[in-house]
């Protein structure tokens, strides 16, 4: 039997709760039967920094892969040049895969000329807005292969990687840029009957006719205060009798130094609305319960690379309300002139966020209500 290839993964510690960590976990566990993995698991202040953890035996037992191999090196930050050099020598990976904003990896691109002589550099990339980030072109040049998480990202990188206007820029071949959207585990996120005690815990023992669900970090670009204001206006529009049977469930921290004091927002603009905070960190199957409790999941972030919560919501059979931005567009299933848009279409289209051009022309699937921001002026 041929020896499995080994991949050195540079990303958020896959045991953590960030979107990058969650997708790192899904990527590793979904391919652990094909590849061996060594991860530099990043966190801001990692409590286990510097100690290699071999979790291979646990993976073998829990996932039934007898030859599974996974080691994690917890680290403060995403690493550095000396660490990668050391790991190349000790672990001898067949490829390096890094994941998240390229600005965190400038130190890696600075040494690409020595690394790529023996080990290819792979990049799992996302970019959430136009115009095309020309300043990233040199970073993309440093990678042997780029997997694009959204169709918009694919269009951006295909356009930029075709440029050859500088001496060091070489257009990439077709196989070097691929559309690889996040995968949602359908064994976890699916329509299911929610246990009565769990529903009671989330909704405080009350019965509601309509449950709107929001699941994000309490940070400004996610616009949680705007969600509260929108819910308040919705309640005003339908009248008190119906509004009393509606609730907004916000799975987030009510107060965050990087975001907003949401209880204060509620007191100021929506004191009479039913708004519940779900603060407890939940397991994946419990998050699936949340989606199944909801009648709709909303994400109106002003910039969004992908939007895991709404993608998981769709798989649970719950419709979504989303801003037309970044990767959220992919989840709407847009058709233009009767044709379902593909990643290749975005090479020409760029993005559908210009409401004057696309509202009414781009038709979503029945599971999605797209929201175009009228503040985006067509140029």
Predicted regions and their residues:
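Conserved donor-binding/catalytic core segment of Leloir-type glycosyltransferases
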Residues: 9, 205-222, 228-231, 248-249
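Carbohydrate-associated surface elements
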Residues: 152, 183
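N-terminal subdomain of nucleotide-sugar transferases
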Residues: 1-57, 91
């Amino acid at each position: 039997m041929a020896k499995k290839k080994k991949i050195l993964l540079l990303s958020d510690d896959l045991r953590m709760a960030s979107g990058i960590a969650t997708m790192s976990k899904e990527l590793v566990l979904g391919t652990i039967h094909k590849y061996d993995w060594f991860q530099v698991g990043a966190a801001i202040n990692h409590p286990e920094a510097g100690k290699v953890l071999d979790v291979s035996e646990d993976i073998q037992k829990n996932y039934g892969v007898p030859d599974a191999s996974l080691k994690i090196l917890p680290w403060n930050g995403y690493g550095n040049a000396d660490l990668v050099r050391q790991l190349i020598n000790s672990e001898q990976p067949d490829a390096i895969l890094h994941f998240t904003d390229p600005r965190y990896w400038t130190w890696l691109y600075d040494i690409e000329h020595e690394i790529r002589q023996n080990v290819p550099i792979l990049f799992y990339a996302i970019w959430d807005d136009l115009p095309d980030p020309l300043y990233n072109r040199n970073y993309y040049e440093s990678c042997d292969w780029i997997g694009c998480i959204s169709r918009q990202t694919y269009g951006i990188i295909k356009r930029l990687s075709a440029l050859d206007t500088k001496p060091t820029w070489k257009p990439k071949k077709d196989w070097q840029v691929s559309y690889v959207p996040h995968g949602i585990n359908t064994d976890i996120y699916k329509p299911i009957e929610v246990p009565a005690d769990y529903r009671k815990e989330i909704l405080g023992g009350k019965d509601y006719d309509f449950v709107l669900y929001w699941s994000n970090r309490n940070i400004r670009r996610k616009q949680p205060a705007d969600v509260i204001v929108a819910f308040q206006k919705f309640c005003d529009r339908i009248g008190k009798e119906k509004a009393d049977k509606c609730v907004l469930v916000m799975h987030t921290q009510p107060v965050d130094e990087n975001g907003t004091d949401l209880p204060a927002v509620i007191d100021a603009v929506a004191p009479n609305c039913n708004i519940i905070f779900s603060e407890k960190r939940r397991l994946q199957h419990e998050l699936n319960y949340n989606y199944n409790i909801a009648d709709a999941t909303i994400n109106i972030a002003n910039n969004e690379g992908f939007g895991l919560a709404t993608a998981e919501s769709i798989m649970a059979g719950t419709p979504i309300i989303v801003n037309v931005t970044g990767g959220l567009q992919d989840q709407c299933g847009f058709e233009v002139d009767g044709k379902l848009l593909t990643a290749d279409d975005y090479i020409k289209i760029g993005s559908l966020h210009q409401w004057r051009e696309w509202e009414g022309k781009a038709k979503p699937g029945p599971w999605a209500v797209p929201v175009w921001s009228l503040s985006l002026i067509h140029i």
